[in-house]
């Protein structure tokens, strides 16, 4: 550990270059370091690294100050400070070196640790570093190394009973980035939702980052061939970033139209907007098949009957009657519904529909159906009572 005079010199030099609003933090650094108040020092460092005005000085503070007592403060906080320092770096090889060096330092500390000396190992810090190393490989476009590291990391995480949220969040975030690179819409969608579910309250995401993620999730929901339930996404607060933006609000409307099987609205949006996003334009035929499937499901839901004619399905989905059988078979193969097809009489009998998160309008329709069902049961009860009076007498 450096002596106090050297630390004072380092901090004084950095303080002179820092934004005036950060000067009180440097005074705290000096005071807490001298008094060995590591927890308080860590809290002050967190404030510094979370402040956007600290960006130009982050790496130098990490190199010249934090690295001198990394073994005294929370291991995940040390990794967080390093990641904040490297956030805007385009030198990915340098970033890998920093991450590898810190990992080696943690491993060295653990190798020297005496059994039962009360100190905690640095396994959590190493796991977080591995996840961020995989992310850096992705940024270098080395997808093979990234995938290998993520697969090894997943095996390790699966064996653990308890994992800090910061680690699982980093793992899901890096994994979702990998799936985005691979255009794996299904995996990206579900992994990104897991990422959002593990976000700590203290984690700050910029508006631009939230909007980009909402956009990417919307595209994946539309193009994923195994994604037919959008309720969780539509109700997530992150979607507010595109609902309130005139450039992207149509994506939200498009997903809503899919959810409720509104063929006409979906068709009108596609005709006007699809050319704005080339990847959607490339998959237009798939999108039209998807709205037909969702319209079929909604037709079953709304009509509240188990038997539908080919004619009913044809009208709802705007498909020729000859294509109805194929559509129903496709829905059954995807696990969206269960039933049987009577080709001779052109009837489809539905026995089960996949559970899904439904909208407020759909809940209202369900309530109306329950009220109607209750009325019918009540009428039947009164009729049976009237006809059975002579028997009871």
Swiss-Prot record:
GO terms for molecular function: structural molecule activity. Keywords: Proteasome. Residues 187-355 form the PCI domain. The keyword Chloroplast does not apply. It holds the Pfam family Rpn9_C. One of its GO terms (cellular component) is proteasome regulatory particle, lid subcomplex. SMART domains: PINT. Present with 12400 molecules/cell in log phase SD medium. Belongs to the proteasome subunit S11 family. Acts as a regulatory subunit of the 26S proteasome which is involved in the ATP-dependent degradation of ubiquitinated proteins. This is 26S proteasome regulatory subunit RPN9. It comes from Saccharomyces cerevisiae (strain ATCC 204508 / S288c). The gene is RPN9.
């Amino acid at each position: 550990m450096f002596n106090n005079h050297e630390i004072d010199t380092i901090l004084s030099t950095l303080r002179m270059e820092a934004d005036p609003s950060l000067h009180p933090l440097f005074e705290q650094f000096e005071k807490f370091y001298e008094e060995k108040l590591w927890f308080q020092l860590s809290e002050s460092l967190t404030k510094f690294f979370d402040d956007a005005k600290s960006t130009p000085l982050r790496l130098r503070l990490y190199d010249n100050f934090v690295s001198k007592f990394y073994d005294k403060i929370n291991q995940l906080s040390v990794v967080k400070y390093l990641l904040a320092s490297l956030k805007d770096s385009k030198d990915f090889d340098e970033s890998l070196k920093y991450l590898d060096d810190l990992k080696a330092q943690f491993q060295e500390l653990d190798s020297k640790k005496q059994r039962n000396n009360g100190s905690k190992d640095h396994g959590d810090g190493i796991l977080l570093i591995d996840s961020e190393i995989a992310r850096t490989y992705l940024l270098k476009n080395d997808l093979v190394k990234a995938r290998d590291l993520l697969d090894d990391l997943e095996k390790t995480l699966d064996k653990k009973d308890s994992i800090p949220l910061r680690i699982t969040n980093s793992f899901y975030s890096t994994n979702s980035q990998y799936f985005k690179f691979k255009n794996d819409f299904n995996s990206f969608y579900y992994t990104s939702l897991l990422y959002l579910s593990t976000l700590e309250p203290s984690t700050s995401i910029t508006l631009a980052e939230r909007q980009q993620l909402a956009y990417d999730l919307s595209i994946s929901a539309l193009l994923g061939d195994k994604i037919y339930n959008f309720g969780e996404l539509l109700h997530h607060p992150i979607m507010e970033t595109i609902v309130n933006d005139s450039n992207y609000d149509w994506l939200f409307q498009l997903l809503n139209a899919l959810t409720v099987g509104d063929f006409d609205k979906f068709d009108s949006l596609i005709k006007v907007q699809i050319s704005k996003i080339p990847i959607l334009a490339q998959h237009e035929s798939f999108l039209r098949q998807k709205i037909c499937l969702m319209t079929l499901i909604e037709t079953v839901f709304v009509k509240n009957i188990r038997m539908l004619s080919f004619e009913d399905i044809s009208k709802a989905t705007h498909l020729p009657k000859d294509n109805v059988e194929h559509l129903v078979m496709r829905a059954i193969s995807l696990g969206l519904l269960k039933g049987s097809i009577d080709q001779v009489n052109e009837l489809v009998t539905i026995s089960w529909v996949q559970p899904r998160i439904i909208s407020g309008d759909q809940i209202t329709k369900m309530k109306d159906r329950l009220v109607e069902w209750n009325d019918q049961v009540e009428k039947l009860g009164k009729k049976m009572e009237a006809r059975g009076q002579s028997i009871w007498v």
